[in-house]
């Protein structure tokens, strides 16, 4: 299982939110480039980057910082937030992003995901953010009537192969991830699923790794690695051990 250290960008700085609320943002580093290099030094193979301003405003808002991170690190970067059209997808991939995450646009313009998957294959990821089982949109400010499973299955039919699944109620809480729902989504769809939200201890990482056989291929770590609750290097080691025999 792969560990993804997260860097959420707001106003060019590295922040963490609580349950997706921008007003609760806490700044952890004024220099996201140095933060990305720090996670790379810890052994990360891929960094999870989110343009929070872009997610709320519907267009890229932290391009200079994103470009600087891409130029500084040698590891892969997956990026989400404000990716609503093919031109933005193409721009990010040309900049050096390894994977782009499409969230709100999958609900509002599902044909975009179809075209993107056909054009870019597995470099396209669905960002599936759920609140009480329903898909949230617009930087989590809105909630649709579509369930996470319904959207995942529809997007699979459009060529999707990978999902980042976030239980919003867990995000930034250090309350433990919703691995039951994450594993069920993976089993029900056959998609590769990256778990996100609520990771608090190394035991949470172990529990996720134990479900690798169910389709959980990665875990995104945010607040826990900024508070020191989880050490990135240890999480990577534990994740590599995979599920127990």
Swiss-Prot record:
It is found in: Cytoplasm. One of its GO terms (biological process) is L-tryptophan biosynthetic process. It catalyses: 1-(5-phospho-beta-D-ribosyl)-5-[(5-phospho-beta-D-ribosylamino)methylideneamino]imidazole-4-carboxamide = 5-[(5-phospho-1-deoxy-D-ribulos-1-ylimino)methylamino]-1-(5-phospho-beta-D-ribosyl)imidazole-4-carboxamide. CDD domains: HisA (cd04732). The active site is at 8 (proton acceptor), 129 (proton donor). One of its GO terms (cellular component) is cytoplasm. GO terms for molecular function: 1-(5-phosphoribosyl)-5-[(5-phosphoribosylamino)methylideneamino]imidazole-4-carboxamide isomerase activity. Its EC number is 5.3.1.16. It comes from Heliobacterium modesticaldum (strain ATCC 51547 / Ice1). It is an enzyme of class 5 (isomerase). This is 1-(5-phosphoribosyl)-5-[(5-phosphoribosylamino)methylideneamino] imidazole-4-carboxamide isomerase. InterPro entries: Aldolase_TIM (IPR013785), His_biosynth (IPR006062), HisA_bact_arch (IPR006063), Isoase_HisA-like (IPR044524), Isoase_HisA-like_bact (IPR023016), RibuloseP-bd_barrel (IPR011060). The keyword Nuclease does not apply. Pathway: Amino-acid biosynthesis; L-histidine biosynthesis; L-histidine from 5-phospho-alpha-D-ribose 1-diphosphate: step 4/9. The gene is hisA. Pfam families: His_biosynth. Belongs to the HisA/HisF family. Keywords: Amino-acid biosynthesis, Cytoplasm, Histidine biosynthesis, Isomerase.
